[in-house]
Amino acid sequence: MPYEKKAVHFGGGNIGRGFVAEFLHNSGYEVVFVDVMDSIIESLQKTSTYKVTEIGDDGEREFTIDHYRAINSKNEMDKVIEEIATADVVTCAVGPNILKFVAEPVAKAIEARKLDYPIAVIACENAINATTTWRGFIESKLSEETKKNIDSKARFANSAIDRIVPQQPPNAGLNVVIEKFHEWCVEQKPFENGGKKPDVKGIHYVDDLEPYIERKLFTVNTSHATAAYYGHQNKIAYIHEVLQDKKLHDIVRDAVKETANLIVKKHGVSTQEQSDYVEQIIKRISNPVLKDNVERVGRAPLRKLSRKERFIGPAAQLAERGESYQTLLGAVEQAYRFQNVEGDEESVELAKILKEHSPEEVVTKVNGIEKGHALFDPLVAIVKKVQGS
């Protein structure tokens, strides 16, 4: 069937296929996947459908995803540009570090765009204001003329996504198993005055995204990663098993008690509402049905230890406010101990950095915290401890 709406999505991974494409497909969009991985693109090109299975406490639901196309941007860049230039929406789920590599085709497509309405640009990443970051890379490749009239060609909206994609069963192919719970919040202001807001079932449009992003990142990601790093140190395989250990369960709860204090005081969320949210998250990550692997959740420790991320982001703000952040510091220590894990390049790089640099250099380089900040000395003490053991 011919589709009236088209979305181009960068990233053929599990989040792309199982979350973003599922929402777009169920809202009547033709989805065009773009990736550089030959195996994923070839599989998508050879297969006309794949299945998304949503799992939860109350059983499973299965969806079939079809009417998609796939392009390898490594050798068909012109085609990618043409698809974006004629699309309604362009999204990505590639990892925050890859945004700079998926900017050029979008910039060229914006330059070439002839449609009389702007394309919606939405990054679906686990990072604060990822679309703004992507926009910076895109605009650096635009002509001055296009930059001046950017609103007529493109609208950039930040988003917050929340959905756990556990380790997939072997031989799953393109099929994706994903948790039933989902939240996708998108700012609506960028679509005012001539913008075209994507009509996607399941997107929750909000005026101010920051409370949603910080609530999600500093609750879901903080609790998930805290469980993973403590679990790894205790040689536990799955997240739900970590949370079955009373001592570790209490540590995870204490970490999100500290971040809840920040969310309530900074964003004016009621204590009860945040407490209910925390309960919901602890229940989600404790779900044995997800069989969520500790090493999968812990991977990429350098990114997770960085300045705006799940530990240092809230801990720095709490330190600036003179509030408690001790449990978060404990989680930071465990994250620093996530070294040389098989299949995770960042954990190897982390071990190298700890070996070659002074504690002060490590804190500045890895955590992005400068001398003089209230968090600097406590972090230096943590790094010294890890280096000494």
Swiss-Prot record:
EC main group: oxidoreductase
Transmembrane stretches, start-end: none
Reactions catalysed according to its record: D-mannitol 1-phosphate + NAD(+) = beta-D-fructose 6-phosphate + NADH + H(+)
Subunit structure: Monomer.
GO molecular function terms listed in the Swiss-Prot or TrEMBL record: mannitol-1-phosphate 5-dehydrogenase activity
EC numbers: 1.1.1.17
Keyword Oxidoreductase: yes
Keywords in alphabetical order: NAD, Oxidoreductase
PANTHER family: ALTRONATE OXIDOREDUCTASE-RELATED, MANNITOL-1-PHOSPHATE 5-DEHYDROGENASE
Active site positions: 216
Sequence similarity: Belongs to the mannitol dehydrogenase family.
GO BP terms, alphabetized: mannitol catabolic process
Chain positions recorded as NAD(+) binding sites: 7-18
Domain of life: Eukaryota
NCBIfam families: PRK02318.2-5 (NF002652)
Full protein name: Mannitol-1-phosphate 5-dehydrogenase
Pfam families registered for this protein in UniProt: Mannitol_dh, Mannitol_dh_C
Function: Catalyzes the NAD(H)-dependent interconversion of D-fructose 6-phosphate and D-mannitol 1-phosphate in the mannitol metabolic pathway.
